[in-house]
């Protein structure tokens, strides 16, 4: 019994998600660094407002700098989670149709969450 490695390599190359592993690795690291930097802001914000009333905290969140950093934090964290979930799904789900469906569902969920967050931030009274 000789295992046909060429057939497996061809099958892997023809997969829709086997484009560039190094690009995916780099994106995972870059989003991780951005999240680490944003977490410093979040920790600072929490400690400086720990004794404040909820109205003061909401007023602080409505400042443009804080809105931008919060949007970056949520967007990058969801994108980082999409990258991680994609790797897990590709590694552990063997059925190609189920794999592709789950990846699309995860992406749609994260897009819907980001859009909902943006709407909630900009349309809160």
Curated annotation (Swiss-Prot):
Q: Which Pfam families match?
A: Sdh_cyt (PF01127)
Topology term for the membrane: Multi-pass membrane protein
Superkingdom as given in the UniProt entry: Bacteria
InterPro entries annotated for this entry? SQR/QFR_C/D, Succ_DH_anchor, SuccDH_FuR_B_TM-su
Q: Which UniProt keywords apply?
A: Cell inner membrane, Cell membrane, Electron transport, Heme, Iron, Membrane, Metal-binding, Transmembrane, Transmembrane helix, Transport, Tricarboxylic acid cycle
Cystines in this chain: none
Chain sites annotated for binding a ubiquinone:
92
Pathway(s) served: Carbohydrate metabolism; tricarboxylic acid cycle
**Localization annotation:** Cell inner membrane
Membrane-spanning regions, if any? Answer: 25-45, 68-89, 100-123
Cofactor: how bound: The heme is bound between the two transmembrane subunits.
* MF terms in GO: electron transfer activity; heme binding; metal ion binding
Q: Which GO terms describe its biological process?
A: cytochrome complex assembly; tricarboxylic acid cycle
The residues that the entry says bind heme are 80
Q: Which residues lie on this side of the membrane: Cytoplasmic?
A: 1-24, 90-99
Where primarily located? membrane
Q: Which cofactor does it need?
A: heme
Residue spans, topological domain Periplasmic: 46-67
Question: According to its record, what are the GO cellular component terms?
Answer: plasma membrane
Matches recorded under SUPFAM superfamilies? Fumarate reductase respiratory complex transmembrane subunits (SSF81343)
Function, as annotated, reads: Membrane-anchoring subunit of succinate dehydrogenase (SDH).
Give the record's subunit note. Answer: Part of an enzyme complex containing four subunits: a flavoprotein, an iron-sulfur protein, plus two membrane-anchoring proteins, SdhC and SdhD.
Protein name in UniProt: Succinate dehydrogenase hydrophobic membrane anchor subunit
Q: Which organism is it from?
A: Rickettsia prowazekii (strain Madrid E)
Per the UniProt record, the lineage of the source organism begins with:
Bacteria, Pseudomonadati, Pseudomonadota, Alphaproteobacteria, Rickettsiales
